């Protein structure tokens, strides 16, 4: 990252969370994490350290006496360990995991802020990119993800989503010169998919934007889409092999990286390859591109629907209907986008406030207003 803006963004992020620690009196200073999930996550990591059982995700104290296997994956566990292990010379494992987990979320906001400053500079200038960083820091919904004391994987999901979009925005501004950026974006998207299936939305936005760009006439977007899909495919397959033991490579779980997601990225790579081949024809007009795009969509949707029809029910589609109704009504982060549960449309609009302003600004920039 060149320029001073990313470094300033990192400083602003650390200053922001430092002020929260000094003036906000967060519970972590009293030895409390944000919610029960944070404690369960640290228990899971502690069990990994003490047993070394990488593929054993059973939590024996949950749903006793049977125990419970969470839908969580190991990548975030490794990130927390990376922040915790340097503390071991100064405290025991229990305390090191507590403070490593408590600081993981705010520390992961640092690279996210740096990426925003780096990618935004080309579009809104240095000052504008730093203003975007400030807006990123002070939004209540985003702060809730990155707050001190929240040892939760959503902070890593959001940082990886920012990485995907920042890499593709930078590629778009450089007019396709930096061909490695879509490949890196695909790898970041695969890392997000390893962390949680919420990353499917990031993949849809990123891949869909590249496909739409090619459809509307940006010819280098076809190759970029292929590189993105290739990075996504290779990294996702590697993640699947690492996350699951060989006996579970054919397991199908909608809410955790499994065979269904492996098949999905293979189909997406096939569709992207079809677009890339068509993109070599510089004379292909809009009707031809539209036909190819439709064929690519069918190449993904038809086999996926035949092999895994439950995929389209969402990550919680296989949960017992009685449990699903209670779960979706009570856990806001698990709610479907359109079928609101506990959250009202007013609350959803409030959460999207920053996006609405960004859309208005983008339209104004596009039409020179």
Predicted features and spans:
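Active-site lumenal/periplasmic loops and adjacent helix-entry segments of GT-C-fold
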Residues: 22-123, 127-162, 192
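Perimembrane helix-loop-helix junctions
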Residues: 202-290
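Alpha-helical transmembrane segments at the extracellular/periplasmic loop-to-helix junctions
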Residues: 258-277, 294-369
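Structural signal for the C-terminal ends of transmembrane alpha-helices
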Residues: 124, 165-175, 210-220, 269-284, ...
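Helix-to-loop transition at the C-terminal end of transmembrane segments
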Residues: 18-36, 246-248, 305-318
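Start-transfer (signal-anchor) and selected internal transmembrane alpha helices
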Residues: 1-26, 36, 277-298, 366-369
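Membrane-embedded helix bundles of polyisoprenyl
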Residues: 13-17, 104-122, 127-174, 178-215, ...
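C-terminal TM-helix exit segments that contain a strictly Trp-centered aromatic cap at the helix terminus
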Residues: 76-80, 236-243, 300-312
């Amino acid at each position: 990252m060149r320029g001073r803006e990313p470094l300033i963004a990192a400083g602003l992020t650390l200053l922001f969370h430092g002020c929260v620690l000094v003036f906000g009196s967060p519970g972590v200073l009293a030895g409390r994490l944000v919610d029960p999930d944070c404690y369960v996550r640290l228990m899971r990591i502690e069990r990994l350290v003490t047993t070394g059982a990488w593929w054993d995700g059973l939590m024996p104290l949950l749903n006793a006496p049977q125990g419970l296997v969470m839908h969580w994956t190991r990548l975030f566990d490794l990130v927390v360990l990376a922040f915790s292990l340097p503390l071991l010379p100064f405290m025991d494992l229990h305390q090191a995991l507590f403070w490593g987990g408590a600081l993981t979320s705010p520390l992961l906001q640092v690279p996210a802020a740096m990426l925003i400053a780096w990618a935004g500079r080309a579009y809104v200038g240095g000052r504008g990119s730093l203003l975007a960083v400030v807006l990123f820091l002070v939004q209540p919904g985003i702060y809730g993800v990155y707050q001190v004391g929240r040892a939760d994987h959503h902070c890593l999901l959001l940082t990886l989503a920012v990485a995907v979009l920042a890499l593709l925005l930078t590629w778009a501004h450089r007019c396709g010169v930096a061909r490695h950026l879509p490949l890196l974006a695909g790898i970041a998207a695969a890392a997000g998919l390893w962390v949680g299936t919420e990353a499917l939305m990031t993949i849809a936005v990123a891949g869909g934007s590249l496909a739409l760009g090619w459809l509307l006439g940006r010819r280098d977007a076809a190759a970029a889409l292929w590189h993105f899909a290739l990075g996504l495919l290779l990294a996702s397959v590697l993640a699947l092999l690492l996350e699951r033991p060989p006996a579970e490579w054919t397991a199908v779980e909608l809410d955790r990286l499994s065979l269904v997601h492996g098949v999905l990225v293979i189909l997406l790579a096939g569709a992207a390859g079809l677009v890339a081949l068509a993109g070599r024809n510089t004379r292909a007009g809009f009707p031809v591109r539209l036909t190819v795009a439709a064929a690519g969509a069918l190449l993904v949707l038809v086999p996926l629907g035949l092999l895994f029809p439950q995929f389209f029910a969402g990550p919680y589609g296989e949960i017992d209907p009685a449990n699903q109704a209670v779960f979706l009504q009570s856990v806001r982060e698990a709610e479907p986008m359109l079928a609101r549960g506990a959250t009202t449309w007013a609350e959803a609009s409030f959460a999207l406030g920053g996006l609405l302003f960004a859309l208005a600004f983008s339209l104004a920039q596009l039409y020179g207003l």
